Regions:
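Serine residues within intrinsically disordered or low-complexity segments
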Residues: 3-4, 23-26, 49
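Short, low-complexity intrinsically disordered segments enriched in A/P/G/S/L with frequent Arg
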Residues: 12-15, 20-21
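N-terminal Sec-pathway targeting helices
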Residues: 33-44
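Bacterial N-terminal signal peptides
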Residues: 44-52
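Catalytic loop of the DD-peptidase/beta-lactamase superfamily, centered on the K-T-G motif
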Residues: 55-109, 221-226, 230-234, 238, ...
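Short active-site loop at a secondary-structure junction
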Residues: 88-96, 117-177, 198-212, 277-280, ...
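Active-site helix/loop module of the DD-peptidase/beta-lactamase fold
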Residues: 122, 127-131, 143-186, 190, ...
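The feature captures the short pre-catalytic strand/loop hairpin that immediately precedes
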Residues: 190-199, 260-274, 350-351
C-alpha cells in the first residue's frame, strides 16, 4: 500500500492512499516478514505436472475410487460447485480466476458480488495491490530491451530523491536493484519516520520495498520525458491488448469496481489512484491480467538475456535448516533442493530443479495472486475483494495446481 505522506519525494507523481494495516510496526520487522514470506513459500513447493490440468478434489476422488482421472471440463464443473461455499465460509464477496495452459488462457471465471447486490463480471475492476509491481517491472525490462535505458545505470545521473541527496549510497541505486528489492529502502517511507532512507549498502541485502518501485518509475519518467503510466501504456498495456487496465482513475471505472471487504467493525478503505503508483493500486480485469501473464511466459518484448535475468534469483533467501525441515515435511529427504529469492519483478522459487514465478498482493480488504511454471506452460491468477481472500486463493490454487503444501504457504 502507498505511503500516507502525500507526494513525498516524488513531486506529486505518485498517488498516496491511506496507510496499510500492519501488525508489526517497525521497518526491521517488515523486512523480516518479507524474507520469511519468500522463504516459506519456496520451501514447500512440489511440482505435479501430470495433474495440473484437473482440480485437486477431482484428483483425490479418482485416487480413492481407482477410476481414471476426470477431464478438465468435468473437473471444472466440480470446481465451480465449490467456489460459492469457499466464498461464504471465508466471508469474501467475490473471486476472479484465470487458468493458463500451454501458455494460453484456457479460461477465466468470476464468482460472487463486486459490491453488495451487484454481481461481479468479467469486466469487474479489481485493485491489484502489489500485483501492480510485475507490470511496472515489465515496463522497465522492455524499455531496457529496447535500449532506452540500462538496468545497471546509476539513477543518480538522472534524479535523486531529495530525502537522500546527501547520502553517498544514492549513487549506487540502479533499476536492477529497484526491481529486485535491493535498494535498502523500507517498504514505505512512513516506516522510517516519513523520510526516505537507505538503511544498508544497495545490492548487499534483500528488503521488500514499494518505494524502490516508485523510485525506478520516477527515474524512467524523467529520463524519457514521459509520464510513467504513459510509458507503461505504450510499452506493455497496448501491445498486449490490456484495454481494461489503468494505473489511475478513468471514467470507465464507474460502476465496475470490486469494493474491498474487511472486518465488519472497520470503515472500508478503497483508495483510487489519481496519479500513478508503480507499486500499488493498479486496476484491471481478470482477463487482462491473464493476458499479461501469458505475455510474460512467452518472454514477449524482451531480449533473451533480460528474459533470463527476470527469472534468475538474485540472492538465495533459504537457510539450510529451513530447507531440511521443509523437505522432511514433504517426505522428500533423499532428493530435495530448494532455492528462493527475488528475480526482476517476480519472486522466483526453484524446487528440485523446477522453477516457479509468483507474486501476491495485499491491501485493506484485497488479496491477489499470480503464479506460473515456465517449463510446464501452466499458470493461475486469482483476485479477491476480501480481507480473508487468501483462504479462497489457497483453495483455488490447490484445485488448479494440486499441491497442498504449496497452497498452504500462500
Amino acid at each position: 500500500m502507498a505511503s500516507s505522506r502525500p507526494g513525498a519525494g516524488f513531486d506529486g507523481a505518485v498517488a498516496r492512499g491511506p496507510p496499510r494495516r500492519y501488525s508489526k510496526k517497525s521497518a526491521l520487522n517488515e523486512i523480516m516478514k518479507a524474507r520469511k514470506w519468500l522463504a516459506a513459500k519456496a520451501l514447500v513447493v512440489a511440482v505435479t505436472s501430470c495433474l495440473s490440468m484437473i482440480p485437486a478434489m477431482a484428483y483425490r476422488k479418482a485416487q480413492s475410487t481407482a477410476r481414471s482421472v476426470p477431464t478438465l471440463e468435468g473437473g471444472r464443473a466440480e470446481f465451480n460447485a465449490h467456489v460459492s461455499e469457499w466464498l461464504k465460509e471465508s466471508d469474501v464477496p467475490s473471486v476472479a480466476v484465470a487458468y493458463i495452459r500451454d501458455r494460453k488462457v484456457a479460461w477465466t471465471e468470476v464468482y460472487g458480488e463486486q459490491s453488495p447486490g451487484v454481481a461481479a463480471t468479467h469486466h469487474t475492476l479489481y485493485n491489484m495491490a502489489s500485483l501492480t509491481k510485475p507490470i511496472t517491472a515489465e515496463t522497465i525490462l522492455r524499455l531496457a530491451s529496447a535500449k532506452k535505458l540500462s538496468l545497471d545505470e546509476s539513477i543518480s545521473k538522472i534524479w535523486i530523491d531529495p530525502d537522500i541527496t546527501d547520502d553517498p549510497y544514492s549513487k549506487l541505486l540502479t533499476p536492477r536493484l529497484c526491481l529486485s528489492h535491493q535498494t535498502g529502502f523500507a517498504n514505505w517511507r512512513r516506516m522510517t519516520g516519513g523520510v526516505l532512507k537507505i538503511r544498508w549498502k544497495p545490492g548487499t541485502q534483500t528488503g521488500y520495498s514499494g518505494e524502490g518501485y516508485n523510485y525506478v518509475g520516477a527515474f524512467a519518467e524523467r529520463k524519457l520525458a514521459r509520464p510513467f503510466d504513459a510509458l507503461a501504456q505504450e510499452t506493455v498495456l497496448d501491445p498486449i491488448g490490456m484495454k481494461e487496465t489503468s494505473y489511475t482513475a478513468k471514467d470507465w471505472y464507474s460502476g465496475r469496481l470490486a469494493v474491498p471487504h474487511g472486518p465488519k467493525a472497520e470503515k472500508p478503505i478503497d483508495p483510487i489512484a489519481t496519479k500513478w503508483n508503480a507499486a500499488d493500486l493498479l486496476r484491471t480485469t481478470i482477463g487482462d491480467y491473464a493476458k499479461f501473464v501469458v505475455s510474460v511466459m512467452r518472454d514477449e518484448g524482451l531480449t533473451a538475456a533480460i528474459a533470463a535475468e527476470r527469472a534468475t534469483i538474485t540472492r538465495d533467501t533459504v537457510k539450510p535448516e529451513d530447507m531440511e525441515k521443509a523437505c522432511r515435511e514433504a517426505g522428500e529427504l533423499s532428493q530435495c533442493t530448494v532455492t528462493a529469492g527475488m528475480g526482476l519483478g517476480w519472486e522466483v522459487e526453484v524446487v528440485n530443479g523446477v522453477k516457479i514465478l509468483n507474486h501476491d498482493g495485499s491491501d485493506w480488504g484485497v488479496r491477489t495472486l499470480a503464479m506460473f511454471v515456465p517449463s510446464q506452460g501452466i499458470g493461475v491468477v486469482v483476485f479477491t475483494n476480501g480481507e480473508n481472500g487468501m483462504r479462497v486463493i489457497r483453495k483455488v490454487v490447490e484445485a488448479l495446481y494440486p499441491n497442498k503444501l504449496y497452497a498452504a504457504t500462500i
